UniProtKB/Swiss-Prot annotation:
GO terms of biological process kind: lactose catabolic process
GO MF terms held by the record: DNA-binding transcription factor activity; transcription cis-regulatory region binding
Role noted for this protein: Negatively regulates the transcription of the lactose utilization genes lacL and lacM.
Regulation: induction: By glucose.
Pathway: Carbohydrate metabolism; lactose degradation [regulation]
Protein name as catalogued: HTH-type transcriptional regulator LacR
Residue ranges annotated for the HTH lacI-type domain, each copy included: 1-58
UniProt DNA-binding region: 4-23
Keyword line: DNA-binding, Repressor, Transcription, Transcription regulation
């Protein structure tokens, strides 16, 4: 069994300091460099193998990357940030927020790890630089570099398949999909996982995918535009239901449908993803798959703590399932 005395001897700090750190003494005042060095030695000597019941309280950073031009999408990530801040306060952790990755890179020595929130693109070269100076990181909802960092994400493929199965159970076989394009990574436009899953799963079920409309950013404005495009092409041949990739898009689509006197859920039904606050107040209120943000934050912090004390383990990507919150846009009779 590795002892505190051995860690103190190799790290060059007193046994009292080491003991207070490893036992989460709230009154201990030491620099981040000191904390990092002690934890590094504890990891190297295998201290945690004999003390698996202990849970350290690291000093962490929040890397927050959002596009403030899109209010509803911004609200989703703002809510994630608020959940993280509240949880950090509850658990008596220390956290500082960074809005620019270069600032975090410059200050990396002050932290044991970071949580990433937001969907704004980051250059791969910057992520590599960050990993060199702060390798312990967990991204929430997205992961721009799964080969470098951990992530906790909603299980979107499961959600899409669940939606299709639910429609089919309720006798709906003409199903459309409205979505935006995926994120850019090093200037390369990726396809969105929701649209990929929709097309592939529909084909495995032998169902028509002609009502698939994927274009542009995830925004209310683009949702409105896509709603108009769908109606211009298919108003006399609407599917029985649409799955829409996010509430942000769904609000715009619903506005376009209302303007063209398309009655939801009579003429076509709608299922959406995210279950943001606004979907309760549109007309009709949207049935939407809920993403449990608090659970994602709790899992992210647990994963980060585990990574800090097990830095040599492989990176992990955890997918969390969603649950449907039923409102008036689609009320399933069979679940």
């Amino acid at each position: 069994m590795r002892t505190i005395k051995e860690i103190a001897l190799e790290s060059g700090y007193s046994p009292a300091t080491v003991s207070r750190l490893l036992n989460n003494d709230p009154n201990l005042s030491i620099t981040a460099d000191t904390k990092n060095k002690i934890l590094e030695i504890a990891n190297k000597l295998g201290y945690w193998e004999d003390h698996q019941e202990k849970k350290i309280k690291p000093t962490i950073a929040l890397l927050y990357r959002v596009n403030h031009n899109e209010q509803l999408q911004d609200e989703y990530f703002t809510s994630l940030k608020q959940a993280l801040v509240s949880t950090v306060e509850r658990d008596a952790l220390k956290m500082k927020t960074f809005y620019d990755i270069e600032d975090l890179i410059k200050n990396a020595s002050l932290f044991q790890g970071f949580i990433g929130v937001g969907a704004e693109p980051i250059e791969n070269a910057q992520l590599v630089k960050l990993h060199k100076v702060l390798p312990n990181g967990v991204f929430v909802d997205t992961n721009p570099a799964p080969e470098l960092f951990d992530s906790i994400r909603p299980n979107l493929p499961f959600t899409v398949k669940n939606a299709i199965d639910l429609f089919i159970k309720n006798g709906i076989n003409k199903i459309g999909f409205i979505g935006g394009v995926g994120p850019k990574h090093d200037h390369i436009q990726e396809n969105d996982l929701r649209s990929i899953t929709f097309v592939e799963y529909m084909k495995t079920r032998g169902m028509d995918t002609k009502w698939t409309c994927v274009e542009g950013p995830v925004s209310v404005e683009n949702g409105y535009k896509l709603g108009k495009m769908v109606l211009a092409k298919y108003k006399n041949d609407l599917p029985e239901a649409f799955l829409i990739a996010s509430d942000t898009l769904a609000v715009g689509v619903l506005q376009a449908f209302n303007e063209e006197n398309v009655n939801v859920p009579k003429d076509t039904k709608i299922l959406s993803i995210n279950n943001s606050n606004v979907v309760k107040y549109v007309s009709p209120p949207l049935s939407s798959f809920n993403i449990n943000q608090q659970e994602m934050i709790d899992m992210a912090l647990d994963t980060l703590t585990h990574l800090i004390i097990r830095p040599d383990r492989p990176n992990i990507d955890i997918r969390m399932n969603t649950n449907l919150v039923v409102r008036k846009s689609f009320v399933p009779q069979e679940k």
